[in-house]
From Swiss-Prot:
This is ERO1-like protein beta. Changing residue 100 to A: Slightly decrease in activity. Significant increased activity. FAD binds at residues 186, 188, 199, 251, 254, 286, 299. Residues 1-33 form the signal peptide. It comes from Homo sapiens (Human). Glutathione may be required to regulate its activity in the endoplasmic reticulum.
Length: 467
């Protein structure tokens, strides 16, 4: 080989390496450049949310989610899909529920609270038996006797009003308590036609959108030639604020769920022990502006918008919990008091945020039209909560139902300001009530958003280090 050829080959190698570095640097800079600045339809900037979440909210909300009151969620994962015959499953075999056998469930939960506090938590053998069920998409229903017995008492603190969600009947034999800490939201392998059908139904039929308008990157939509989605956003910008907000909430929820899957991805499995962690390739596939034709940054901005909406709801509902009559009751007086103190501390932080979304800008037209639009808004969202029963993966269904109910509870709060202001200090109110399930869903859903924003910061660092 001649010297000239060798020099040419070496030069090409250097050029390729330089091009790779430039590409990675460009990717990082584009992601950061496009997911920044002031959000549409509000006066808040992304950097302020990042700092507020990192230093004030995330550490406290994570701690709150570990408390008994907030870690147990009752859900019916056996409700049939009301819209189509669902036959989709996770691509991983363990993406279904494997609850503990009936014989392993402590008798206290079935016999009421007659033997309350008399038994210790599940012994080691029971825990080992149930841990076999906690794999990938499987739901682990392991609970302590004391926790299960306390749930019956919690029920008497609950009441309800009109909802933005289709709530599960907690009295149904199919409803079961799930320990959320034993069932973290993460990648299960659930994907393909079944998953796309769920999101397609949500976007195409429940976002105030005519069938002639298609959202970008929809694999179930007909080919649109050179249309890169601009026609969709032209249509979206022409909508009233309320309908734009609705779409952004759904898109933000979708983005948050996708971030959780990217951040807790099955990296490898050795001798039956899975290893979970962030997957940069999956993150780029879902959010890189080049790979998503500009959609990724829009989705992430909608995540921040959703965070603002739920943050605002927490600040507005604080007076409900500040009353002495409201207890976060589990039966452990000392822990209950500590949990309420922590929750009130979080509420104080939410009220201190200076750039809240102004919900009064919504449904502010003539009373008749505003009332009709608000009801349409509520029914559309309620229908979306029903679609969550069509998710083929039980773990995905669990977290989908919880986060949908959490957002529905946030909307209920934002549109009940007058009722909250009139709450009596020392007696229950018929004007506004939250069930325990709504409270658990609200705080855990916001915790998921807080985690998503934290995960996004981590991915930015990983992209920077990969240059």
């Amino acid at each position: 080989m001649s010297q000239g050829v060798r020099r040419a080959g070496a030069g090409q190698g250097v050029a390729a390496a330089v091009q790779l570095l430039v590409t990675l640097s460009f990717l990082r800079s584009v992601v950061e450049a496009q997911v920044t600045g002031v959000l549409d339809d509000c006066l808040c900037d992304i950097d302020s949310i990042d700092n507020f979440n990192t230093y004030k909210i995330f550490p406290k909300i994570k701690k709150l989610q570990e408390r008994d009151y907030f870690r147990y969620y009752k859900v019916n994962l056996k409700r049939p899909c009301p819209f189509w015959a669902e036959d989709g499953h996770c691509s991983i075999k363990d993406c279904h529920v494997e609850p503990c056998p009936e014989s392993k469930i402590p008798v206290g939960i079935k016999a009421g609270h007659s033997n309350k506090y008399l038994k210790m938590a599940n012994n080691t053998k029971e825990l080992e038996d149930c841990e076999q069920a906690n794999k990938l998409g499987a739901i682990n229903s392991t609970l302590s006797n004391q926790s299960k017995e306390a749930f019956i008492d919690w029920a008497r603190y609950d009441d309800s009003r009109d909802h933005f969600c289709e709530l599960d009947d907690e009295r149904s034999p199919a409803a079961q308590y799930v320990d959320l800490l034993l069932n973290p939201e993460r990648y299960t392998g659930y994907k393909g036609t079944s998953a796309w059908r769920v999101w397609n139904s949500i976007y195409e039929e429940n976002c105030f959108k005519p069938r002639s308008v298609y959202r970008p990157l929809n694999p179930l939509a007909p080919s649109r030639g050179e249309d890169d989605g601009e026609s969709f956003y032209t249509w979206l910008e022409g909508l009233c604020l309320e309908k734009r907000v609705f779409y952004k909430l759904i898109s933000g929820l979708h983005a948050s769920i996708n971030l959780h899957l990217c951040a807790n991805y099955l990296l490898e499995e050795t001798w039956g022990k899975p290893s979970w962690g962030p997957n940069i390739k999956e993150f780029k596939h879902r959010f890189d502006p080049v790979e998503t034709k500009g959609e990724g940054p829009r989705r992430l901005k909608n995540l921040y918008f959703l965070y603002l909406i739920e943050l605002r709801a927490l600040s507005k509902v604080a007076p409900y919990f500040e009353r002495s009559i409201v207890d976060l009751y589990t039966g452990n007086a000392e822990e209950d008091a500590d949990t309420k103190t922590l929750l009130l501390n979080i509420f104080q932080d939410t009220k201190s945020f200076p750039m809240h979304f102004d919900e009064k800008s919504m449904f502010a037209g003539d009373k008749k039209g505003a009332k009709s639009l608000k009801e349409e808004f509520r029914l559309h969202f309620k229908n979306i909560s029903r679609i969550m029963d069509c998710v083929g993966c039980d773990k995905c269904r669990l977290w989908g139902k919880l986060q949908t109910q959490g957002l529905g509870t946030a909307l209920k709060i934002l549109f009940s300001e007058k009722e909250i202001q009139k709450l009596p200090e020392n007696s229950p109110s018929k004007g506004f009530q939250l069930t325990r399930q709504e409270i658990v869903a609200l705080l855990n859903a916001f915790g998921r958003l807080s985690t998503s924003i934290r995960d996004l910061q981590n991915f930015k660092v990983l992209l920077q280090h990969s240059r």
